[in-house]
């Protein structure tokens, strides 16, 4: 971690989490996955239905938190997919896992790995990569997934 000692906080397994907006939601999963990769993301208040109230929290914060946009054709494991889930602005984040898979958490479901099917490709708004990302950073995420998850 750039020559510094990185202290990891305890996070629950990335899969199998119950959904509670603003507490254990898709952003929490994204934040915790990146923590396991050694990249800290801020926690911020997310009011219910923020995307219906004129806010655009993901697009307003991606660049400020170290992300830059990349072409969907250049997707690499660990990249963040922003999706429009019943909204006109991106209101859902998923981690691209490679080999056609993603990790995400949607309302009324447990967090899970899922195939990046046409359904999700149609909902995808954009793909983002963190400036500090490197391929080995995905190891912490992979280790957690191997310990606790299955494909749906």
Which residue stretches match the model-derived regions?
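Short, well-ordered, mixed-charge alpha-helical segments that flank or form enzyme active sites
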Residues: 2, 111-113, 136
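...with weaker cross-activation on analogous glycine-rich loops/strands in unrelated enzymes
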Residues: 8, 46-111, 117, 151
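Long, low-complexity intrinsically disordered regions
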Residues: 11-14, 29-32, 128-152
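Flexible glycine-rich active-site/ligand-binding loops centered on an Asp-His dyad
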Residues: 118-123
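Active-site nucleophilic cysteine motif
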Residues: 18-37
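Extracytoplasmic copper-binding redox domains, predominantly the cupredoxin/blue-copper superfamily
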Residues: 40
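Short, structured interface segments
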Residues: 1-10
């Amino acid at each position: 971690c750039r020559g510094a000692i990185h202290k990891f906080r305890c996070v629950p397994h990335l899969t199998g989490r119950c959904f509670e907006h603003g507490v254990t939601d898709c952003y929490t999963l994204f934040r915790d996955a990146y923590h396991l990769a050694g990249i800290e993301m801020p926690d911020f208040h997310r009011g219910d239905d923020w995307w219906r109230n004129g806010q655009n929290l993901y697009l307003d914060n991606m660049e400020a938190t170290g992300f830059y946009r990349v072409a969907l054709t250049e997707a690499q494991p660990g990249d963040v997919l922003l999706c429009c889930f019943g909204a006109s602005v991106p209101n859902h984040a998923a981690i691209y896992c490679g080999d056609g898979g993603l990790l995400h958490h949607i309302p009324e479901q447990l967090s899970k790995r899922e195939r990046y099917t046409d359904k999700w490709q149609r909902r995808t708004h954009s793909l983002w990569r963190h400036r500090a990302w490197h391929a080995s950073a995905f190891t912490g995420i992979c280790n957690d997934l191997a310990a606790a998850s299955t494909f749906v």
